[in-house]
Structure formats: C-alpha cells, structure tokens
Amino acid sequence: MNISYKWLLEYLPCTLSPQEIADTLTSIGLETGGVEEIETIRGGLRGLVIGHVLTCEEHPNSDHLHITTVDVGADAPLQIVCGAPNVAAGQKVVVATVGTTLYHGEEEFAIKKSKIRGVESFGMICSEVEIGVGSSNDGTIVLPSDAPVGMPAAEYYHVESDYCIEVDITPNRVDATSHYGVARDLAASLKRNGVPAELKLPEVNLPTDIIDSRIEVKVADATACPRYQGLVIRDITVGESPEWLRNRLQAIGLRPINNIVDITNYVLHEFGQPLHAFDLAFIKGDRVHVQTVAEGTPFVTLDGVERKLTAEDLMICDSNGDPMCVAGVFGGLHSGVTEKTTDIFLESANFNPTMVRRTARRLGLNTDSSFRFERGLDPERTDWALRRAASLILEIAGGHLGGMTDVYSNPLKPHLISLSFEKVNSVIGRTIEPEMVRSILNSLEIRISKEEDGVMTLEVPRYRTDVTRDVDVIEEIMRIYGYNQVELTGYIRASLGHETETDRRYKWQTVVSEQLVGAGFNEILNNSLTAGSYYEGLKSHPREMAVELMNPLSQELNCMRQTLLFGGLETLSHNLRRKHLSLYLFEWGKCYRFHAAKRTDETPLAAYAEDDRLGIWICGQRVHNSWAHPEEPTSVFELKAVVEQVLCRVGIETGAYTLKTADNDLYASAMEVKTRSGKLLGTFGTVSTELIKRFEIEQPVYFAELLWDALMSESARYKLEARDLPRFPEVKRDLALLLDKAVSFAEIESLARGCEKKLLRRVELFDVYEGKNLPAGKKSYAVSFFLRNDEKTLNDKQIEAIMAKIRTTLEQKLGAQLR
C-alpha cells in the first residue's frame, strides 16, 4: 500500500522526514518497502524557464526550421533552432536550456548544444507533450503575454513534490490500510518516545437544509450485510477534480477519473472505508435491494467484461432485482457515474468478509474495496466516511443534499478484554510502568473502561479485528513500546525437544539445497496449481488422477500438479526466450494425486494423496566455448551424476540402489532409481520431445524427479560415517566386454556389486564403442573395477578370484564376451 508523505501530515503534523517516518513505521510492525520522491510532473520541470521569442527567421538550409532568438532572463538571448510550425516572434514560450533532461514515457534525453543544418542551437522550445503538461504535440506551447520571462517553469506550472512510502500491510492489519490508520500508529509511537503528536481527523459539517429525496434500502440478510448506509445528492456537476485532489491520488499511484469517483477513492485511502457512487437515474423504483441473484445471471462490470453470477454472490440491485454492483468488489458498467450524471446515490456499507472474498476470487477481481472488505471492516465507520465524502462532493461538485438511509439491524457491542499489569510484564519479560501501559493503550484508542486491583477491563475498537485476546493487547503494547527496549536477560529458558521426522526432512532439504547451489544450480518455486490440459493423454500421470479445483481462477490453474516437471518447463521456456540458454534448476514441492477407487462414504479423503519431491532440470551448455575448452553440451549422464551425488549425500550409497530402464511417457528415455527391494526412489532422463515443443523449447531438457518421502525413509536405514583415508592401496582391473546394445552399464555395475560386496569399491565405464568390426546388434564397453581391502593389501590370488567371478557372472547373465 502506498502512503503519501504530505497527505499523512494532514492528520499528524510532525517534523519527521519521509525516511524517518518509514523507519518508525517499520519498527512498530508496519514494514516499509521503500521511499520514493515523486513530482506532479515527471522531472519537476527542472532546467525549463519561461522565454520571450524576440526574433524568428526561416532557416536558410531547411524548408520547415526556424532560427529564433529567445530571452530567458539571462545575460544574453539564446539562439534556438525550432521546428514547430507555430513559433513566431513575440510569443511567450517554455524553453529547455542546455543540460535539461526531458522525459517521454520511459525514455529520457538531455538537451545539448548542437548544430542543426549548420546553425548552432542552445536549447529547445517545447511542446506540451515534451514536458508532460498536456497531450498536444502540434507545436510549441504559447503562454499568455503576462507570463514572466525567466520564471522557472516548475513555479509557473505549480509543480509539487511529495514522497511515496510503500507500506507492506499484513493481512490482519486492515485498520492500517489508510492514511489515517497509519497516522494513528505513528502518533502512538511518537507519544511513546516523548514527541508531541496530535492526531487530527477532519471535521465534517453537512448542510441542514436537506431536500426531500431518499432511496429506500432493503437488506435481505443482515449477516451478509451488517450495515448499509446511503444518501442522495442532486444537481451535481461531474468534471475534472481540483488540482489538490488529483495530486493526492497520483501521489499514491491512482489515476484521476472524475471528481465524484476521485472523492470516493480519496476517502477510501484517507479513512479505509470503501464507498460507491451510483447514477441515480439508473436506480429503478428508487429502491436498493442488497441480495443474491439467480444462478447464471449475466452482469457487465465497469471494465466492460460480462461475468456470470452465482446464487452466492451478494449484489446491489434495483427494485426490479436487476444487479447494479457486486457488493464490496466492483461496480456495474451501466450504473456508474459518467459526465452526464446529475444525481447520485452514495453508498457506504459493511459486507461479510467471507462472501466478498469468495466472490472476488471466483470473478478474478482484486480491487481496493475487496482488499479491505475481505479482511473485515468495522460497521461503525461507515457513517463518518459517508458524511466526509458527501461534504467533499458538495464542496467540489456542488449539488443539494437529500435524505440519508441507514439499515443497521444488529449494532455491535464493544469488545471487552481483561488484562492485568502482571501478565503484561510476565509476557514481555520486563516491568513496564502502569502509566506507560495506559498511555500506549490510549494512543491506540483502546479504552480502559474499568481498572481494579491491577486488572484492566479494555474496550477494543471494532476496527481492530486482530485484537481479540489479552495476549493480542500485550503484542500491541510491545509493538509501540519497542522490541528493542527489552534487553536479553542473563539466562535463557528453552525446551530442547528431540528431532522429529519433519525436522530431519527439512534439515536434509537444506543440506541438499546447499549441495546443488554449490554445483551451480538455482532454486525455483512454482505454483502448485497447473493446467489440467498438461495431463491429457498421459499414461504415467492420467488426467483422471488430477485433483481438480471446484472454482479455478483460470483454465491454466484448474488442478493440482501431479509432477514438478511442467512448472519447471514453464520456467525454462520463460528464461530461454530471454536468452538465458544454459539453465541448472531445482525445486522442492508437493505433488498431488486422486485415486477414485480408494474413496468411500466413510473415508472421502482417502482418495487424495500428496508427497514431497525434488525436481532437477538441466538444459543448455555444460561448458561454454573458450580458448581453454571447446563447447560441451549438457547430457543425461551429467544429470545421472547429480542424482547419484544427492543419493550419496543423504547416505544412500551406490550399492544400495539399482538403475533400470523406465517406460514413462514424460521422457524420451528414462531410468528408474529403485532400492534393492524394488521401492521407487525417483526417475530421471531426457524429457519427451513432444512435451518440450509444447513449451516452445528447442533444445534437449534433462529432468530428474526424486520422491523425497521415499528417499528419507530409505536413508534412515543407513548411518553416515566419517572414515579414515585408506591405509592400503586400491587395485584397478579393466575388462573390455562385447555386449548386446540393449545392455546398460547399470546392469553391469549391479551384477558386479552382487558378486563382491565387501572389496569392490567402484565400477566405472571409461569407453564405449559401436561401429564397424563388431557383430550386428553389439557394442563394446571398457569397464574399470576398483578393489581394496581396508585391513590388508590384496594379493594376486584374491584379485583374480574376484575378477573371475565377475567375468563368469557377466557371461552367464548378460551374454558378455571378453574382447
């Protein structure tokens, strides 16, 4: 949320700088994202002055340029070459002197001394669009004859500067979603620090001569709409807002529309209460009904989009039941205020947060009004906001005030909380004087209605929807008192619990994340929601096993993901289009599946399952072309190495798992990682060409998806040990094997480890050959076997016995032949 510095000072006059205010707000829990200086005209018209054109002659080398001399109040006139068709001697103009920076959209350019068609030019005579004071670019600005020569253009155009403070409001602090709300917290902090701070709310005085004009209001459900107020104003003039109002809205990033709409927006950001103005001519029967409508009713909102309503959407309707506005969310196209409007009905209401949130999400509308209503507003605050807006409308747009309607069926009682000074000190951890506690509570508008034996009975304002318990009040006291005022004691009390399984999993996630980042990977975070269309036609992840959303935000986000793959492909595609061609990514996330067969009336949730996974993507170049190394693309073998390193890091060593070819339609070719007992730990391989083409990716993508729950379960069976460096030498033996092309190295490694579990340390493939001089359907593998005994040096007899056993096994199981 954006806060204007000057606007804020209207409610809390103080001498703090914008940055000091931002720092203070952050210290009391209203964290600020930054402070930005803004001006009503970009650049503040610095370097521009009012000039008087003394002479204007045609350029000798051009048929459209003019050579002018312009008095800008300096020691001598400036010679300026100008291309505007309307420039003439005697005019008062706006001149950009040398060194001035002008802005056009996102572009900017500096005025320099130049030579145009052989004639020197020492500035520029400007048009409206060039300096940002209008939209005309047909010629130079011609000012009135009494415009003072040499006056800075910023002074002539009344350029104002301000500071925009970005405040990050947490969802529970709806009371701080306005300038007055922020000022209230700031005042409390200043008072706590001994700085005089008087919070001022503008007085509202409405005329007593009210015309006989009133709208009848009927609320169908007081729970859906606890309070609805409105009044009529006739004979208004809709037009442009005054400069001060436009400046206030522009300072916080809002676009002025017209004086009526601007006033409702102004009061919203001033006091936090949303308002809506209806064109009275479109309220049929002079009656407003707050109700729901029939399922499927079409409704065109202010943005011109037709939306289908449901029977749960709360609407503002006319006497015929025709919807005019989505309550608390968005107005209708045909009932809003236009330049032709002369009479209005001004609404200030309170709507049920749950209903507003549900409707706003379903319709895909996130407005300033819904943002506040969703968090819960105080029905008592509608009245002041309505009167304030009516007062401003009468002042700015004229008109005559009609009657007010107020439907408030069940006025809320004050929320009472009991709190002792003893508990305040106990929870905070230090003694705070009762007078300080009372002062802080008073500054937060929390009234002490009773105090007896050190126990206070507090009346909490209804707008503080987040303060419902005594500990919430203590948090408020602590927030204003200052967390940095509470020093650490000489001892720390804490409970040290045993490491839970959840703790263990998070610990290993951190360890593996650090390992991957150290290897050059970047962590990504994708949405758990995905497009159901991704799963159409897949056998490994069929569409019918997707968890569908009942009310999706869009068709691109209509189901929960079954695999991490597609989110990563979206990220890869996005970055590849921006010329980031070599990408190493990983992601932690949950995946979800629906098993219809497991669903019963007694256990409806048994059909749903979720599990944690680790996704790893590799794409692009492993080594870029340089003087030292030729270019080398990534490969599935690089991904395989990463997978093995992750498994090793969590304690699952090479011999504890097997790699087998997988039939998975996500991949062009893939391997499954399984335990010796056949439990699946993950899958990796080359992503299917058809899939990557759907994401407009034109280079191979290698993807691994590890089942983290299964990995953690398996790793718990092994104990990580720190070992001494081997004291005895390692022996290497090589075999050149002739094999069928279908045989994988993983099969060779697995069989070899089965032959010798104790002494065989590593199995490595160092050469592959396929081609001439080999029988059809055959290939040659050159494999190294590394043997070591940690207790003594191996002798030739032991080595040969092991190697003979390995050779025999490979011959019998794989049909291998020694070359």
Swiss-Prot record:
Q: Which residues form the tRNA-binding domain?
A: 42-154
Domain B5 spans what residues?
Answer: 412-488
Q: State the Gene Ontology BP annotations.
A: phenylalanyl-tRNA aminoacylation
Q: Where is the FDX-ACB domain?
A: 726-819
The UniProt record gives the binding positions of Mg(2+) as 466, 472, 475-476
Keywords assigned: Aminoacyl-tRNA synthetase, ATP-binding, Cytoplasm, Ligase, Magnesium, Metal-binding, Nucleotide-binding, Protein biosynthesis, RNA-binding, tRNA-binding
Q: Which SMART domains match?
A: B3_4, B5, FDX-ACB
> Which GO-annotated molecular functions does the record name?
ATP binding; magnesium ion binding; phenylalanine-tRNA ligase activity; tRNA binding
**Origin superkingdom:** Bacteria
Per the record, what is one GO cellular component? phenylalanine-tRNA ligase complex
Which HAMAP family does the annotation name? Phe_tRNA_synth_beta1
Tell me what this protein is called. Answer: Phenylalanine--tRNA ligase beta subunit
